[in-house]
Amino acid sequence: SYYPGCTLKTQAKELDASARRAAEALGSTLDELENWQCCGGVYPTSRDELATKLSSVRALAAAEKNGGILVTLCSACHNVIKQTNDLMINDPEKAQRVNNYLGPDDAYGGGTKVMHYLEVLRDEITFDAVAERVTAPLNGKKIAAYYGCLLLRPGKVMQMDDPENPRIMEDFISSLGAD
C-alpha cells in the first residue's frame, strides 16, 4: 500500500506523479491506500499522546490487511509512521490503549513493514534495475544528497541506512548516472 501523505497531494504533486511514473517504468505500481488520513505529524501539541497516533495506526492497520507493506515517500510521514509502528510493536500497553480507540474490527496487530520509496528501489527493485531502465542518464551532473533530520533518525527505529554514514541516496543518484 502506498501512503502519499498530505504534502504529496498539495505542495509536492510533482514528486508524487514522478514516483508513480518511475514505479510503472520499473514494472511496479504504487497502489494508494484508500481513505488515508494525515500521518499525525501536525498533531504534536495534542494533550493526549495516544490520540496523535491514531491516523498513523489506521494506515498501518489498513496496510496490514492489504499485504503488510506500507510505502511512504514523504520523510516526515515516514518518520511519524515508522516511529508509531515501533511503539505499537514494542509497547503492548500503549498498543492496547490505541487499539481500544479503534475498536476490534480495526485493531492493528503489528504486522506492517513500513518502507520508504528509496528502500523499495534499493531492496525490492534494486538500484541495478533502476540503472538499466534510465532513459536519460544524468552523466556528468554532480548532485548532492540531502537526508534532512527525519529520514534516518532515530537510527534504531528507522533502520534505513547508517545514520552516521548513509549511502542510500548517493547509490540512487549513481544509478541515475550522476556523480
What spans do the regions from the language model cover?
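Iron-sulfur cluster-binding electron-transfer modules in prokaryotic oxidoreductases
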Residues: 1-179
